[in-house]
Amino acid sequence: MVAAPAQPGSGGLSLCLASVGVVKALSVVAFKLVWTHSIEKTEWQEDWRITPGGLELMQARVKGFGAGMEPAPDARLVDGWFQWQPKRAAMPEVVLANSGAAGEWRLCSDGHCETLSGIFGHPIGINVTTMRACDP
C-alpha cells in the first residue's frame, strides 16, 4: 500500500480515493501522481498537496512533449523533464479517467509508488477514480 490506512479521529486530512463503489482513505499530506500518456508513451508527473480547501497541484513535470502534452509557457527543462508550477486554486475533487491504452495511474508517497488497482486491491480497469481531501 502506498500509505497507511487513515485512522478515524487522528486529526488532519487524508486523501480519499473512490472507484467502483469502493472508498479508500490514505494518511498522506502530499503525494505524486504519475501516468504514461496513451499516445506519446511519455511519462507525466504531478505533485499534489492536501489542504482544507481541497487538492492543490504544486508542480507538474513531463518528460518530453507531444499531442496534448505541451509544457506550460513558463516550464524549465531540468534533468530531461519540463517542470512548472501550475497557478490554479485548490480543487474539491479530481477525477482520473483511464483509457486502458497506456497502463494505470500510479500514486507515490514517501518514495513508494503503487497503481490504483494495487491500492484498491482489485483491478479498476477503465473505471473512473475520484480523489478528494477527506477527514479520516
Listing of model-derived features with the role each one plays in the protein:
Residues 1, 53, 133:
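Residue-level marker of positions within ordered structural domains that often coincide
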Residues 3-8:
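Boundary at the C-terminal end of the N-terminal hydrophobic targeting segment
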Residues 9-66, 71:
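N-terminal secretory signal peptides
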Residues 70-136:
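Mature, soluble, non-transmembrane domains
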